[in-house]
Amino acid sequence: MVELQDKVAVVTGASSGIGASIAETLANQGVKVVLTGRDESRLAEVAKRIQDNKQAVVETSIVDVTHKEEVTELVEKTKEKFGQIDILVNSAGLMLSSAITEGDVEAWEAMIDVNIKGTLYTINAVLPSMLNQSSGHIINIASISGFEVTKKSTLYSASKAAVHSITQGLEKELAKTGVRVTSISPGMVDTPLSGDTDWGARKKLDPKDIAEAAIYALQQPSHVNVNEVTVRPV
């Protein structure tokens, strides 16, 4: 089991839901956490909640992952502050209900910008330093929707399928470098992103369930890469 104490993590989409829960769980393990998102007040609330419960090292940074220059600045400032980045969690995401036949191009572009480009921008920013230190772990939050498409989820599903493919390809590119990469594909999770979406008789997952999956992947021995995790409600 890998010890996470004093490692440095950047978590995108950390103002609520899965990102906030992963950040809090990492802090519980002694990880120094940089919370990023677009909502300053909600980020501050998450940071306060973490700091109230433990002696945690928590920083916040207002970042829009669709802006490459903001992502680059985030990574550089984090390295200046803490020396390195050991963990990147790509949790920033956007889910809009939009069928192709509706022709809502703005919704499509928004999901592509956040879910695909945002993921690529953060990976691109942290990867050189991770390769230089021969260690690091990138966790990308994908979705069951990347495999199971409904008539209203075509573009969202496509964007999350892309996240899955990016992770699978990156794992092959990073073989023997010491840098690991994991995609976590949750089923329906009780977060602001899912809203009032009907999931039938199944109970929604708690964001903590996804956080525990992330910790499991991170704590594996350095020669083990948990490349893909699927988490479904019972």
Swiss-Prot record:
InterPro entries recorded: NAD(P)-bd_dom_sf, SDR_fam
Domain of life the protein comes from: Bacteria
Binding positions (NADP(+)): 10-34
Family: Belongs to the short-chain dehydrogenases/reductases (SDR) family.
Coiled coil: none
Keywords, comma-separated and alphabetical: Oxidoreductase
Stretches that traverse the bilayer: none
MF (Gene Ontology): oxidoreductase activity
Lineage: Bacteria, Bacillati, Bacillota, Bacilli, Bacillales
Binding-site residues for substrate, renumbered to this chain: S143
Name of the top EC class for this enzyme: oxidoreductase
Full protein name: Uncharacterized oxidoreductase SSP0419
Residue positions of the active site: Y156 (proton acceptor)
Annotated PANTHER family: DEHYDROGENASE/REDUCTASE SDR FAMILY MEMBER 11, DEHYDROGENASE_REDUCTASE SDR FAMILY MEMBER 11
E.C. code: 1.-.-.-
